[in-house]
Amino acid sequence: SKTADNVVAVPEGEVLSIPMPPGTNDLRHEIELVACLGRGGRNLTLEEAQEAIWGWSVGIDFTVADQKLPSGGRDMMRSKVFERSAPVSFVKPAYRTPLPNPVDLWLYVNNQKRQAGSTSNLVLSPYEQIVELSRYFTLEPGDIIFTGTPNGSSTLAVGDMIDAGVNGIGSIKVKIVENA
């Protein structure tokens, strides 16, 4: 989960600066295809889930992997919810960009490939994920759903330049900077 203010749009060709969250030595990246809903609903069918998607985006889900609770478990709130932890590309309307199956995702750090994979390797397709989510809560127009990441998530450092994309959808660039 992310809060709305964690999401930030990255214009194509620009580089977004992301401050290293305080108190971490283990900031990680996850490239993901993002489904952007134009319609909501509850208990959607597969066909309704497909029709609910207004567009597609590229997203990076940043996670602080070393935030612990006093009891020893991972603090999921501080791990996932921090400034600019969910950069996304501008949305490509689904009617102009039909989602091929499968879709390839990739992420480079300092020009070295860290993640590469396909939506065919996800446990549930993006559409099936929307169906499943709608069983548990009402989806709303404007919701964005990060749909999963390939293997290869790794630790980032200040100064790292990340170039990530989803074939047919777009790409984004971000740089990890000192926290002011």
Residue ranges and their predicted role:
Residues N6-V7, S17, E32-V34, G55-S57, ...:
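Structural motif
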Residues S1-I31:
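Extended, compositionally biased flexible segments
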Residues S1-K2, V10, P21, C36-G38, ...:
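Short beta-strand-to-turn element immediately C-terminal to the catalytic PLP-Schiff-base lysine
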Residues T63-A180:
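Catalytic-pocket segment enriched in acidic/His residues
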Residues S1, V34-R39, V88, I130-V131:
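Short, conserved beta-strand element in jelly-roll/cupin
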Residues V15-L27, G41-E48, M76-K80, P93-R96, ...:
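A generic local secondary-structure boundary/capping motif
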Residues E30-I60:
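RNA pseudouridine synthases
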Residues E12-V15, P22, L44-A49, Q67-G72, ...:
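A short secondary-structure junction signal
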